């Protein structure tokens, strides 16, 4: 695209996510919100803050607009894969939030469609832009074996309390933690096990406990709860000589390193949070991480916009989320088996067989019946009149 190209973006949704992304896009250079499919309340706010923005009654109208290059789906959408497919077929780039689990096969199909249409399909990963998690990922990807964790523990709670329906579901929380864990370690586990607990027998799950076992022996334990009154997003990564503690909700000192080596008194925490650029952080042995104040929504939007303008379609994370979805499907199977470990490879092979099997197209003619292979799924039955 031309260097002075401005990306015209449409916003779909009426919740806080859409409002937040509309404001974030206003802070990104070479990006302009030109249309939105939203409620009257948010429409009034957008028209007040973004002069000239067009308002559509539904997502279909937004997708059909010729003055929209990309669409952001930041709020829960009914049948998200179908809506994304419509947008890609209309040659729109897509940034979407996975508010409820999407299957591995659906994500694979969408990724393939995006490649064929030469459009960028990206799913939001706001927490991956958190400066503390960026530091942690950088530290774990270093050459020093000192920072290779043998055990990881994550605790997540949105702080909605009482398991009400105003916040994310247990499924959404676990899927998000699976994604962060995959980003930190750079791979999917070999096997998983999971259990859920309910306050009442017929109630939705109030908490979940998931264990991940990796091929090299590393173990990760993920815990999620929707019954706690206080928000919590904490990580603990244990190495042979140090434990890294990360609290995403701690603004002052999100990262602490508890060292057990001779240089530090046993068990004493090193609180680290000077806001310095990554390039100025001299080595892994120091305790000064590259933390800086940031707006994760703005960073997410900037990454999306710059990838499109640079025609860098390889920045799509659809394949990554397909791997996360595969791990989630294994967790679901383990829950159905009351916590028994489930192999990721076994789930993957079943997924491939299910996708590869073609159903039969049954053509009924009078009293006769014949079958031929169908090219589309699901199977069709035709009855001539």
Segments from the language model and where they lie:
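C-terminal glycine/acidic-rich active-site capping loop/insertion
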Residues: 241-319, 340-344, 356-385
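N-terminal Rossmann-like dinucleotide-binding module
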Residues: 1-50
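Beta-loop-alpha module in the N-terminal Rossmann-like domain of NAD(P)-dependent dehydrogenases
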Residues: 50-113
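A contiguous active-site-proximal alpha/beta segment in oxidoreductase catalytic domains
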Residues: 78, 101-164
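Rossmann-like dinucleotide-binding domain that binds NAD(P)(H)
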Residues: 161-230, 234-238, 249-250, 319
């Amino acid at each position: 695209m031309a260097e002075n190209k401005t990306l015209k973006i449409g916003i779909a949704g009426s919740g806080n996510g859409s409002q937040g992304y509309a404001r974030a896009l206003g802070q990104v250079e070479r990006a302009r919100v030109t249309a939105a499919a939203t409620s009257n309340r948010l429409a009034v706010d957008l028209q007040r803050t973004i002069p000239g923005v067009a308002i559509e009654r539904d997502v279909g109208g937004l997708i059909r607009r010729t003055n929209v290059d990309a669409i952001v789906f930041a709020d829960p959408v009914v049948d998200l894969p179908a809506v994304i497919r419509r947008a890609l077929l209309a040659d729109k780039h897509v940034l979407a939030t996975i508010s409820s689990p999407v299957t591995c096969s659906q994500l694979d199909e969408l990724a393939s469609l995006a490649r064929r249409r030469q459009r960028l399909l990206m799913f939001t990963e706001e927490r991956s832009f958190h400066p503390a998690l960026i530091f942690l990922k950088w530290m774990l990807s270093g050459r020093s074996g000192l920072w290779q964790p043998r055990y990881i523990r994550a605790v997540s709670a949105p702080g909605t309390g009482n398991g009400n329906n105003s916040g994310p579901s247990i499924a959404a929380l676990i899927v998000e933690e699976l994604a962060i864990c995959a980003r930190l370690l750079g791979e999917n586990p070999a096997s998983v096990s999971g259990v859920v607990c309910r306050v009442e027998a017929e109630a939705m799950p109030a908490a979940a406990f998931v264990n991940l076992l990796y091929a090299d022996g590393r173990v990760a334990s993920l815990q999620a709860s929707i019954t706690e009154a206080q928000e919590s997003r904490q990580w603990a990564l244990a190495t042979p000589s140090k434990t890294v503690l990360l609290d995403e909700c701690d603004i002052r000192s999100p990262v602490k390193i508890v060292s057990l080596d001779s240089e530090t008194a046993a068990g004493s925490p090193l609180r680290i949070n000077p806001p310095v650029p990554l390039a100025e952080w001299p080595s892994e042995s120091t305790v000064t991480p590259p933390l800086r104040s940031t707006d994760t929504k703005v960073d997410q939007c900037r990454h999306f916009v710059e990838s499109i303008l640079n025609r860098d379609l390889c920045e799509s994370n659809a394949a990554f989320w397909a791997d996360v979805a595969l791990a989630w499907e294994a967790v679901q199977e383990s829950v159905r088996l009351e916590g028994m470990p489930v192999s990721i490879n076994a789930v993957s092979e079943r997924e491939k067989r299910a996708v590869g099997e073609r159903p039969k197209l049954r053509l009924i003619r009078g009293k006769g019946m014949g079958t031929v292979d169908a090219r589309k799924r699901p199977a069709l039955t035709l009855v001539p009149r």
